[in-house]
Amino acid sequence: MRILVKGTGVAGLTAAFELVRTGVTVEVCERNAEPSRGASWYAGGMLAPWCERESAEAAVLTLGQAALDWWDEATPGLVVRHGTLVVAPARDKVELSRFASRTAGYRWVDEGEIAALEPDLAGRFRSGLYFPGEGHLDPRLALKSLHERLCTMGVRFHMGIPLDEEPFDRVVDCTGSAAIGGISDLRGVRGEMLYLATPEVSLSRPVRLLHPRIPLYIVPREPGRFMVGATMIETEDAGAISARSMMEFLNAAYAVHPAFAEAEIIETGTGVRPAYPDNLPDVTQDGRTIFINGAHRHGFLLSPAMARQAAEFVCQTLSQKERDHETSGEWRRA
């Protein structure tokens, strides 16, 4: 069986990986000449199902828990399993209790325990939540690593050139926000981020700063570099970061550690995340085309589960008529 995967974002590459492991022949096409630099490129890369459960459906936790092991296997050495630290300014301590009431998988930590986890935050926060079972990765390194591994597994990539779908037995469409307008109910949610560089701060894990209006996070990358994100704005505009978002990011970083005030802003970016009305992804099939889309802010967390479901679709022996226009609904039942 010959399968075409459309898209080289996280959904496309994870789908290609799961499919090729079933023994089928996989080819990947990308409309751009270079691998996708859409929402996946600007992602936080937090593999944090318990933290995300605070504001997401139970399916995000249920299906996201396997993501750490999946990424560890697919991209060896890139997953950092140091957990997540959630903190809040003293005036917003009630936000910690609210956050804790909506999820699980954490333990309360006091000022001394926070200092033990993150020495550079010693004396800055009186209490917090520590999620030991979570992790993170650098999305850009993960995408590059997965692309290279797929090449070694015999997957062919077609970049920036039209490809005839007719010779393929199945097509797996993972085109993300590019499919908005072509897939019913799919919308775009803008996310903004920036990168800071400073040798004065060291963090071992993502730090989430709670705020009543806009909670933000700081994710360590290579030594001395940090990704700060991310907004969720109901628009499909992928223009430059707004002044308001920039100020909120910088204020949040300064609240975590004052040394960020002297950090260099080395990059800003925006991406449009594809999302359905309930903010849950779905895997659907129409004829011989399977659609993977709607990951919203959970691309790296939920793409492995979506990819596995797509591979199951391909391997099923149901007749074409039985599969036409079928929607799995697994995401909304979990």
Language-model features and meaning:
Residues 44-117:
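Dinucleotide-binding Rossmann-like beta1-alpha1 core, especially the glycine-rich loop
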Residues 129-166, 170, 174:
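Helical element adjacent to the flavin cofactor pocket in flavoenzyme catalytic cores
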Residues 20-40:
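Glycine-rich FAD pyrophosphate-binding loop
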Residues 263-334:
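C-terminal catalytic lobe of FAD-dependent flavoproteins
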Residues 2-27:
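N-terminal Rossmann-like FAD-binding beta1-loop-alpha1 element of flavoenzymes
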